């Protein structure tokens, strides 16, 4: 009889424990899992990075080609704590366009070349929002001409959040990471 009571109590405790655990897991929000990226996703995101450099360096379409690489609410951060550009108009201006009218590109000549952007060593990984990435930023010399000490060679990098839209992959957030920090070390500001 004592053994039967002990078994009954053990079973009740086990059932009660399972009910509590089940209720707790049902109430806990499910963490969004990152969907795997396809080979085409990786190609498309790499093309986004390539288009970024060309749109920024050429100020094409008065900077709006650059701005359109972002989501409508996309943000470019100039380092943590630095200024930020939000939305299409501010992003076009960040590329030198918009109200600024691409003056840097118009003034460029052999003696005053435009420093071009090279995004290299891109690492792209799935994330619950779409994908995250980090890469280095390099400014090569132009026609054998160097700019100045702050605009040649490795000048930091980027840390990105990409989302897939009906227009393809776009930047949701991009931070220009300045040395000595390494891309991937920042937490996106809100």
Language model features with spans:
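N-terminal secretory signal peptides that target proteins for export/translocation
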Residues: 1-9
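Active-site micro-motifs of SAM-dependent methyltransferase domains
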Residues: 54, 76, 176
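Bacterial N-terminal signal peptides
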Residues: 10-22
